Amino acid sequence: MTSPQALQLIKDPDRLESRLKEIPAEPGVYFMRDSQDQILYIGKSKKLRSRVRSYFRKFNELGPRLELMVRQVAEIEFIVTDTEAEALALEANLIKQHQPHFNVLLKDDKKYPYLCITWSEAYPRIFITRKRRAEAKDDRYYGPYTDTHLLRQTLGLVKRIFPLRQRPKPLFKDRPCLNFDIGRCPGVCQQLIASEDYRKTIHKVAMIFQGRTSELIDTLTPQMEAAAENLNFEQAARIRDQINGLKTLGEEQKVSLPDDTVSRDAIALAADEQHACIQLFQIRAGRLVGRLGFVADAQSGPPGAILQRVLEEHYAGADPVEIPAEILVQTELPEAEMLATYLTEYKGRKVTLLVPQRQSKAELIEMVERNAQYELARTQRFSDRNAEAQKDLAELLDLPELPQRIEGYDISHVQGSDAVASRVVFIDGLPAKQHYRHYKIKNPNVTAGHSDDFASLAEVVQRRFRKFIEHPETDRLSDPDWPDLIMIDGGKGQLSAVVNALSGTGLLEDLQIVSLAKQREEIFLPGESLPLNTDPDQPGVQLLRRLRDEAHRFAVSFHRQQRTERMRRSRLDEIPGLGYERQKQLLAAFRSIDYIREASPEQLATVPLIGPRLAQQIYDYFHP
């Protein structure tokens, strides 16, 4: 563990050399920590000492992003593994667990949606989303897909082929809706199908998005024939229709390739100085079953290193059956052999990585690269608009440089009850959701019936900058968490509360703070009684408005969540013997108080920690 006073290693050559000598020349994983003991970066190597030493020997060749990281490194730790493949697997798990700032290669790009299957629920849902739920670890995400229209079309066809849950919540309490009557839903809302049987259907659907449509058809065909032999013609016809639907879906995905029995992925990128747009085509049995898109920081490394990291992150969350036998890459990867070994061990079958030379495979990579070029052009146009807004905002507020990291704050409550705050972050004009934060207001004077937005904002900014207040020696301007601009949702009063809260800390000399009032979209500066003379539609003001609206949305959603949770708890708290853990189990199983009220004693008793006696007590409470 590093000392808060520990010097950065680059400023202490003797300690740096001593530390590097302690690192073995074996495979493993290394951690870079700053002076506050925060993990900056996690990496892996087949020779730990050589890899870590390279950061300091080739300091001037690292590029801006890694150079900034190395300047902050105060301690280096490592874990030795037996093999390179073990190092890669351990690195993937640790990055997923800690999410270090300099490991975040892929940008949070909302334009690429995912398809989610909620395996965490007894009756899984299937839906398209642009946000991954971190709290539901059993859920499976496929994507991100570049063609939203095709994804919706595919999901629509899948829902016509298989009887699936159509609604997130039931339309009626005591009977199924029309979807059940016409055969599009098996009656999930009334539990007319067992969870185990429904999950079997979902497994079939998952095979489609895993690129295993042909395998699914091969599985269904003997089932259809067996049903016909047993004179169960209705079931045979239903399976026949499913097979025909799957064949229709497959025909729309064909690509021209030899040896179309081989499953393969093809990956390529196109980059400028800022952005690297990556396309990954998934081809199974000669069909293009998925076209995934990623946007990365072009400064994070050379093309081969970026492609390697994308593949590592992508396959880290995949099922072994989803990993193809062959992966075509645009350029040589720095650790291709290590990645191939890891994927081979994980899949249980040989996985080959290669830069294609044969005409058909080389043409496939060229096609993927062309698509990446189109995505880069779109990203550049969007980036240019954001750059214009940043430049306009810098001129409007007379900032010393373009505001790359902007933070927005808002308070949400109902007359002081369930008071919360939000912090949202825009980087280069785009939401950076990995930096969003919620705050529960702890001020004892803010209670139901007694609201105080000024005191709440003061508390939040003091908590936000606690690290810098307690350690004033920190080089805050080089800290990646230091904002170029802070925007407060409100007027002069809210702005003054924040400024007063930070006065005397020494931070204000390096902080740019403004407020944006809702009524007339007026911008206030500290110490000024009148708002700036601005046009509400100019690019810089529009950027602040987007930030303000996002901070408001994020605060309100958290407030509603807290209020709903409190109301849930207050009802269940009245039932004797129903403690916190049992309440959690009930809510996880039934999702709401209404569903718990409608459940029978037998259904309640199936929940973990709820026996027959307590189940009867719960039922009696709701049915006096």
From Swiss-Prot:
Stored SUPFAM superfamilies: C-terminal UvrC-binding domain of UvrB, GIY-YIG endonuclease, RuvA domain 2-like
Q: Spell out the subcellular localization from the entry.
A: Cytoplasm
**Is Transferase there in the keyword field?**
no
Subunit note: Interacts with UvrB in an incision complex.
Determine if Transmembrane helix is one of this entry's keywords.
no
* Source organism of the structure: Cyanothece sp. (strain PCC 7425 / ATCC 29141)
Segments forming domain UVR: 214-249
Q: What is the name attached to this protein's record?
A: UvrABC system protein C
The UniProt family comment states: Belongs to the UvrC family.
